[in-house]
């Protein structure tokens, strides 16, 4: 049911936001897929690519959209943040896609944002993010910290009785911004500095033994 709601919302947005104008004279409506198929983020983003292709096939089996078939155009930004921007420009300018579904990390989203705003194209961003950003060219489908992280802290504090906290994450914008918000929230709730541990690791880190031991 949830997948159907997302699918319906997606196609409705395509219809009402004006992207059908570009598609009117084309044989297909092009959907850009900007997810890493190689590198560190491939384990997460490949699944999103597969999901988009499945939804495109399902929609085409149901007659397409606006009387036209959808055509997925897939590129691989390879978990390389500057390459995300290059591939976004390629999809919009060269491939002439009508909309793009892509990114996972906030650093990749921030890398492509100037491209989407410059070329006035639309990005569907699929996961939670740290907030503190809004653009008419991005459809943010995930939760911000006040919708996800803060309620989790409230549950752990009030229902589980957690007293000591570890704010861990990969060393980039989403964990750092979210943890900054959480740290301030915990302190406002009376948690002492000594009971808050903050730790960041690089992408691809796999040795968690020392962190757990601490």
Give residue ranges: language-model regions.
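Cofactor-binding loop segments of dinucleotide-utilizing enzymes, especially the Rossmann-like FAD-
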Residues: 36, 77, 170
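Acidic/histidine-rich, surface-exposed loop or edge segments in extracytoplasmic proteins
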Residues: 32-40
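Short, low-complexity disordered leader/linker segments with a strong preference
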Residues: 1-30
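Immediate post-signal peptide segment of exported/extracytoplasmic ligand-binding proteins
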Residues: 22-33, 62-69, 157-163
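Extracellular/periplasmic Venus flytrap/periplasmic-binding protein
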Residues: 86, 130-131, 137-214
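Short, polar/charged alpha-helical segment
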Residues: 44-66, 181-188
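Beta-alpha junction/loop-to-helix N-cap segments that form part of ligand/metal-binding clefts
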Residues: 28, 43-50, 63-132, 202-209
């Amino acid at each position: 049911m949830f997948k159907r709601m997302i699918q319906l919302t997606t196609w409705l947005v395509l219809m009402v936001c004006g992207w059908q104008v570009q598609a009117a004279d084309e044989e297909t409506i092009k959907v850009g897929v900007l997810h890493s198929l190689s590198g560190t983020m491939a384990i997460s983003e490949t699944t999103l690519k597969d999901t988009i292709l499945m939804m495109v096939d399902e929609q085409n089996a149901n007659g397409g959209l606006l009387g036209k078939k959808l055509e997925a155009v897939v590129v691989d930004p390879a978990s390389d943040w500057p390459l995300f921007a290059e591939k976004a420009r390629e999809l919009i300018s060269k491939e002439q896609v009508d909309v793009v579904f892509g990114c996972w990390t906030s650093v990749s989203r921030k890398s492509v944002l100037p491209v989407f705003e410059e070329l006035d194209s639309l990005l569907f961003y699929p996961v939670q993010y740290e907030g503190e950003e809004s653009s008419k060219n991005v459809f943010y489908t995930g939760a911000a910290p006040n919708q996800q992280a803060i309620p989790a802290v409230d549950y752990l504090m009030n229902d589980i009785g957690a007293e000591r906290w570890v704010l861990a994450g990969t060393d980039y914008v989403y964990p750092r911004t979210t943890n900054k918000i959480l740290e301030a929230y915990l302190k406002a709730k009376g948690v002492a500095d000594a009971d808050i541990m903050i730790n960041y690791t690089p992408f691809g880190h796999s040795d968690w033994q020392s962190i757990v031991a601490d």
